[in-house]
Amino acid sequence: MTLKRSVIGRPKNQVETVKALGLKKIGDSRELADTPAIRGMIKTVQHLVEVEA
């Protein structure tokens, strides 16, 4: 997963979700386990991140 858009001006819950996913700056990437909790977090910020299968 890669952060593609900035969290500046986004609601607090979206900013905290991006942090919880381990993303800090635009372009940061992480490989995460495919769990229901992670999927829920991705759904919350799907407009800010790009997910590669």
UniProtKB/Swiss-Prot annotation:
Similarity section: Belongs to the universal ribosomal protein uL30 family.
Gene3D superfamilies in alphabetical order: Ribosomal protein L30, ferredoxin-like fold domain
GO biological process entries: translation
InterPro entries: Ribo_uL30_ferredoxin-like_sf (IPR036919), Ribosomal_uL30_bac-type (IPR005996), Ribosomal_uL30_ferredoxin-like (IPR016082)
Record keywords: Ribonucleoprotein, Ribosomal protein
Coiled-coil ranges from the UniProt annotation: none
Assigned GO CC terms: cytosolic large ribosomal subunit
Pfam family, one: Ribosomal_L30
Protein name as it appears in the record: Large ribosomal subunit protein uL30
Subunit structure: Part of the 50S ribosomal subunit.
Species the sequence originates in: Deinococcus geothermalis (strain DSM 11300 / CIP 105573 / AG-3a)
Taxonomic path: Bacteria, Thermotogati, Deinococcota, Deinococci, Deinococcales
MF GO annotations: structural constituent of ribosome
Record carries keyword Lipid metabolism: no
